[in-house]
Amino acid sequence: MVGEIPVLLIMKKPIVVSGDVSVYDVAKLMVEQDVPCVLVVCERPNHESIEVATDKDIIKKVLIRKLPPDKVKVEDISSGKLVTIPPNTTIDEALEIMNKYKTNELFIVDDGKIVGVITEEDLIKIAPEIISTLKELVNYLLQIIDEVTSGDISDKSKEIQNINQGKDNKKDSESDIRKKKIMLIK
């Protein structure tokens, strides 16, 4: 199922900017690259940190306050609260983590390095595939219900029991028996 896919297969390479870049330039880059967030390398006294700036940060911390985006540095609005996950995290697990930490982006860390980002938007884009898979599952379950109510399954079940007990043909090999079972299921 789609939810079992590891985020490694759908993650994107994160965009990294210097903390002294203007919010205007970062917003322009985000629009050009069609991404809702960037990693920000901030040079702080005595240390360097990696933070995140999102489109929501720009709206809440700059635009709503009517600050000039070309004068505000991105490091002044970025946050050090990165939520990280390993590359083998499944999509279902990623959604749970996003909900738990109330975040729209997760950063994928491998061997201590940020190697990717997955956003809520990325997960929404694959939602049609999830819906399609769920529809297939529902149709399959409805088919089983129909077979059970029509008695077809019990007939197949008896045939499989006969095959297992060797009543069908004692000369059949294991491979032949498997093939017969598969044909019954189909």
From Swiss-Prot:
A Pfam short name: CBS
Keyword annotations of the record: CBS domain, Repeat
Keyword Amino-acid biosynthesis included in the entry's annotation: no
Domain of life the protein comes from: Archaea
Zinc is among the record's keywords: no
InterPro entries the record matches: CBS_dom, CBS_dom_sf, Diverse_CBS-Domain
Domain CBS, first and last residues per copy: 10-69, 77-133
Record's protein name: Uncharacterized protein MJ0450
Provenance organism: Methanocaldococcus jannaschii (strain ATCC 43067 / DSM 2661 / JAL-1 / JCM 10045 / NBRC 100440)
